[in-house]
Amino acid sequence: MIRFRPAIAALFLLVSGVALGLTPAARADSQSIRDVISSQIDAFLADDVVAAFDHASPTIQRIFGTPERFGEMVQQGYPMVWRPAEVTFLSTEERGGRLFQNVMVRDADGALHILEYEMIEGASGWKIDGVRLRAPAAGAA
């Protein structure tokens, strides 16, 4: 079971959200966004690629076509998301009308990874529209 650090992350999000000038709506959506990402990671941990695929945006679903192909891509390209040891939510950022959730993941070997989840809101709620691996801060290990 992975450890989520919501209390520390919530304080950080509150402070960073105010500092980054997030709108009240964006700040309110932060918890919903974190819930979607957490649910997808839980699905990967359970090898439930169908549930994980459901959290992907229609664009991502069109690109990969099937839950199985999507799961293979994540397993091979984002192993730290497939089997994280620890997940910590960092800041939520609003840029160009889009919301991005930064997430720090510790992999099974103890290495830290910073991922930026691009989120899109649709009729059925928030979906993950892409994930980008960012370089961690110097000395973060």
In which residue ranges do the predicted regions lie?
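Positively charged n-region of N-terminal signal peptides that target proteins for export
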Residues: M1-P6
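Short, low-complexity N-terminal intrinsically disordered segments enriched in polar/charged residues
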Residues: L20-A46
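Short solvent-exposed beta->alpha transition segments
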Residues: Q31-D35, S39, V49-G96
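Bacterial N-terminal signal peptides
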Residues: A10-G21
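Exposed beta-sheet edge and beta->alpha loop/turn motif
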Residues: S91-A141
